[in-house]
């Protein structure tokens, strides 16, 4: 079927092992596994705290594959850099809710919500990430309902609300 994709656990395990050999200075390694036009599937491995980030125009859908860690969600992101497409990274994430993560956990992070992935001390955290374009109701962006945000840098999305 056009657009169909099946990623088996054995294949993810192979990618996980390869990523572990390619850890960069930012304590992470990543690989785009599949591209589907306006969204993609990535595998990320972290062996140290990830930089805080927020995405104005994308939802992060995450499935923890291996390891242990914590997701910090929400709070205030300060001192970050905003790049193309509303991608904000770096700086300091103050406050936010903490969620323990383990293999099999499934996470939906709405657009514009600051977050950071923190592996457990001395451990790693590997997760499958689906970056999906955010679609806003007409009341949240100019134009017609169902329109994808285009670099507006803001939504009315709040932590704990969908």
Q: What do the PLM-derived regions correspond to, one by one?
A:
Residues 122-140:
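A short hydrophobic beta-strand segment most commonly corresponding to one strand
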């Amino acid at each position: 079927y056009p657009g169909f994709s099946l990623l088996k656990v054995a294949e993810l395990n192979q990618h996980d092992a390869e990523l572990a050999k390619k850890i960069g200075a930012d304590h992470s390694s990543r690989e785009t596994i599949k591209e589907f036009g306006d969204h993609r599937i990535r595998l990320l491995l972290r062996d140290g705290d990830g930089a805080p980030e927020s995405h104005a125009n994308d939802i992060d859908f995450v499935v923890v594959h291996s390891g242990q860690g914590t997701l910090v969600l929400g709070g205030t992101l300060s001192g970050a850099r905003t790049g193309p497409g509303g991608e904000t990274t770096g700086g300091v994430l103050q406050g936010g809710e903490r969620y323990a993560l383990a293999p099999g956990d499934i996470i939906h992070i709405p657009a514009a919500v600051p977050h950071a992935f923190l592996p457990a001390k001395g451990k790693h955290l590997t997760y499958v990430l689906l970056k999906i374009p955010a679609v806003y109701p007409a009341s949240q962006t100019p134009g017609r309902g169902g329109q994808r945000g285009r670099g507006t840098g803001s939504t009315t999305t709040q932590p704990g609300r969908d």
